[in-house]
Amino acid sequence: SGEMSAKNNDPLYWYTTTEEETLFAWYPSSETLLTEWTVASDQTIEESYKNSDFLYAYEKMKFRSERKLKFHHGTVKLIINVKGDGDTVSEEDLKDIVFTVSAVTKGSMAEGKLQSAAGVEATVMKPYLLENAREGYAYSFQLLMIPQDMSGKLFFKVALKDGRNFGHTPGNGEGILEGGHQYTYNVGVGKPGLKVTIEKDSVSWDGDDEEVEGTDRE
């Protein structure tokens, strides 16, 4: 959590006390209006992972409103914990595992919401490997994504060094990923395939939100 300050000192005026204004702000800042956002397909380096996120605020306010902008994460955060079943896939089998995610990496802003860009095909994404895996798991990964619906689409893929490959396709309505939310997937690799469970589906990812206050000007 840190401080944000506007670079432009030009104030925002309300012409009447009943007029409603739409305020849209984002960080990192840019000289032009934020209309689209792209996450890195290869997030194996921590810098690429962190640079895939942005904060934004979209509020409708009147002059007498409490003028606070609450910044939210624009992307989806995935935490993926992986282990073998201990029978058909051992911890040794998981060494040098290749875990990938298929998803659209380009999004567009509409009415203050980020959504996957139309007509863009899914890209193979590589997540960031955490130094310490969750207890009971061999590996833990993190990935930042554009909000989208992965229902009925190949989502995860696991490739083992012995040539075995596994995939996971969420069922109808099970792959909806909302911006500003964190999804923890616990993945078991083995027979007959991937056993995937979601831990506390759609938990709000608001731990780093910022509030910026305005001043009274008419």
Identify the residue ranges that each predicted region occupies:
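Edge beta-strands of extracellular beta-sandwich domains
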Residues: 35-39, 165-173
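Intrinsically disordered, low-complexity repeat and linker tracts
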Residues: 184-218
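Short, low-hydrophobicity acidic/polar segments
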Residues: 1-93, 137-140, 145, 178, ...
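Surface-exposed loop/edge segments in extracytoplasmic proteins
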Residues: 1, 90, 106-112, 163-170
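Short, surface-exposed linear segments at secondary-structure transitions and domain or protein termini
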Residues: 3-7, 123-124, 174-187
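Exposed beta-strand face motif in extracellular beta-rich ectodomains
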Residues: 19-23, 150-156
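Conserved structural position at the C-terminal beta-strand
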Residues: 27, 158-160
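Short helix-loop boundary/capping segments
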Residues: 62, 70-73, 77-145, 150-153
